[in-house]
Regions:
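Hydrophobic transmembrane alpha-helices and their immediate loop junctions
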Residues: 1-264
Length: 264
């Protein structure tokens, strides 16, 4: 869904069902805040453990969203489904021991946190799935279709438009609604940040792990890379790439979870 279509759909929804829309935005905002804050806190905490107190001294190891949210990155996340927070300030000169190892750990900390949250929330959602739906619903659609972000029920679940007659335990829908939205958002943010484009984490991982820190950028190149990233985002090209990658990862993880829980 492109930006104009999403805005139009949300505008129509707000006009026709303002209460339902505002309830959804509470879920959506909570998922955004938690996802972005934990991503950046992870960077700062690992940097602190590696010897750099910069993030701690500047108050970035906090759950106060005002310290973390980047206006453009947050708007992008709302409109496009992926975005970023304010980068945590890191001073590599404070690192103890191996500089490249410490820098690599700091770079992957945010992505590792998002992937962990994705796995935990999707696993809990898999466990709750047979408790949420009437048995005939699961039999008709299949468990995976009711859990996948590409499945038939995802939109109905996260937008709160499921008929209670289909549910075995209606109150669980509120929990499942957040878990599936939270899982999808964390996976998208993780994959997005792994792209090897400055200023994303993937660039630092590539530079530290593969290039051994040999690639340096001046301010002009850094700004050019940021502009190129924004153009890719708003052109829709990046959305298509992310959807393919996240869809494949989610499908594989879901297959494993359904086998482990015996609910396939």
């Amino acid at each position: 869904m492109n930006i104009l279509n999403r805005l139009q759909a949300w505008g129509n929804w707000f006009t026709n069902d303002p209460v339902g829309f505002l309830i959804f935005m509470v879920y959506y905002a909570a998922a955004i805040l938690i996802t972005l804050m934990l991503h950046e806190i992870a960077h700062g905490y690992v940097a602190y453990r590696c010897g750099d107190p910069t993030a701690k001294m500047l108050g970035r190891l906090t759950f106060d969203p005002r310290k973390h949210l980047d206006p453009l990155g947050t708007v992008s996340l709302v409109l496009l489904g992926f975005g970023w927070a304010k980068p945590v300030p890191v001073n590599p000169r404070n690192f103890r021991g191996n500089y490249l190892r410490a820098n690599l750990l700091v770079s992957v900390a945010g992505v590792a946190t998002n992937l962990t949250l994705f796995i935990i929330s999707l696993f809990i959602a898999t466990l709750l799935n047979p408790l949420l739906w009437q048995p005939e619903v699961i039999q008709y659609y299949g468990a995976k279709e009711l859990l996948s972000s590409n499945g038939v029920a995802f939109g109905a679940i996260v937008y709160g438009m499921v008929n209670d007659s289909l549910l075995a335990t209606p109150w669980l829908l509120h929990v499942q609604r957040f878990l599936l939205l939270f899982a999808a958002m964390n996976l998208t943010i993780a994959v997005f940040n792994l792209l090897p484009i400055p200023p994303l984490d993937g660039f630092h991982v590539l530079n530290d792990l593969v290039l051994k820190g040999r690639l340096t950028m001046n301010a002009q190149f850094y700004r050019f890379a940021q502009i190129a990233l924004l153009l890719l985002m708003f052109s829709g090209v990046l959305i298509s790439i992310l959807q393919v990658i996240t869809g494949a990862v989610e499908s594989g993880v879901l297959n494993v979870f359904l086998l482990l829980t015996g609910t396939a």
